[in-house]
From Swiss-Prot:
<comment type="similarity">
    <text>Belongs to the peptidase C14B family.</text>
</comment>
<feature type="region of interest" description="Disordered">
    <location>
        <begin position="1"/>
        <end position="47"/>
    </location>
</feature>
<comment type="function">
    <text>Involved in cell death (apoptosis).</text>
</comment>
<dbReference type="GO" id="GO:0006915">
    <property type="term" value="P:apoptotic process"/>
</dbReference>
<dbReference type="InterPro" id="IPR029030">
    <property type="entry name" value="Caspase-like_dom_sf"/>
</dbReference>
<dbReference type="Pfam" id="PF00656">
    <property type="entry name" value="Peptidase_C14"/>
</dbReference>
<feature type="active site">
    <location>
        <position position="147"/>
    </location>
</feature>
<keyword id="KW-0788">Thiol protease</keyword>
<keyword id="KW-0053">Apoptosis</keyword>
<protein>
    <recommendedName>
        <fullName>Metacaspase-1</fullName>
        <ecNumber>3.4.22.-</ecNumber>
    </recommendedName>
</protein>
<dbReference type="GO" id="GO:0004197">
    <property type="term" value="F:cysteine-type endopeptidase activity"/>
</dbReference>
<keyword id="KW-0865">Zymogen</keyword>
<dbReference type="InterPro" id="IPR050452">
    <property type="entry name" value="Metacaspase"/>
</dbReference>
<feature type="active site">
    <location>
        <position position="203"/>
    </location>
</feature>
<dbReference type="InterPro" id="IPR011600">
    <property type="entry name" value="Pept_C14_caspase"/>
</dbReference>
<keyword id="KW-0378">Hydrolase</keyword>
<dbReference type="GO" id="GO:0005737">
    <property type="term" value="C:cytoplasm"/>
</dbReference>
Amino acid sequence: MYSGRSGAPPPAHSPYPNSYNHGPPGHSAGHNVPPPPPTQPVQFGHGAPQGYSFQYSNCTGKRKALLIGINYFGQRGQLRGCINDVKNMSTYLNQNFGYAREDMVILTDDQQNPMSQPTKANILRAMHWLVKDARPNDSLFFHYSGHGGQTKDLDGDEEDGNDEVIYPVDFRSAGHIVDDEMHRIMVKSLLPGVRLTAIFDSCHSGSALDLPYIYSTQGILKEPNLAKEAGQGLLSVVSAYARGDVSGMLSTVGGLIKKATSGDASHSKARQTKTSPADVIMWSGSKDNQTSQDATIAGEATGAMSWAFITALKKNPQQSYVQLLRSIRDELATKYSQKPQLSCSHPLNTDLLYVM
């Protein structure tokens, strides 16, 4: 359906300052540039089995982007700024990070082509396209601006009892898309060293990709108990997958299912950990119990999170993760009450240079 990725990876000295080890040295709005991400696998630690590791991406490989903006024209709860968010983000990614227009899929509800409408079927198809054939050090980008919400959690993996959802333009007939499904498509399949950057400018978006590590400007908010999960056999599936041991993975899954269906209470809610050997980062515009703002900034309707992310990076393109999180918070604080969050598929050294 969608064209493949075109062009060679950026050259060794990329003009894009947020690729690993690129850009003018020492430039960071008067400060030293934070250290780049390590190039070797990093152990999860925190009680995880020895050898259970993840890999940061240096973001020098191929680039693909999926951008979704839904204004819900003619529907109750119509929004004004979501399509503008996508236009602004696509221009920013193209001009500042080397994402080619032909390697972007844009789904907005002002387009005439039915395949470019943000329907549930088109969104799911595009999610599969985004992660297809991804390789280590590729940089994938996912952006959603539209309505978000919550629905009752059916698999027991949410602390508040609710799954986070997004609403396609045809949600009244086709239904919503649940965070579990987005995680399965866009996170679970990624190899070590593949970067997926996601931005959700929607209500109840704090855990929209079901990533287990959550950070705020104050530090870490949430992290999984890997020692407990390892004791339940929940990490062995991922460990086998990382080793390429498909038979081991299947036997582990089979064992978990057998235990879960045999009435063993301790395994009745056994589920695979949501950690990943890949490098998945998510910026969200609100915690799960907050609502995001559809705003007017400089005379243009826009989503507050999308605007703050672009504004903060334009002012200083070489910040650490925690510096960028604070910069986004400071931009939002001038106009809004919502608090930004950073979620990750692995434990994150927030003092490293943010690359994309």
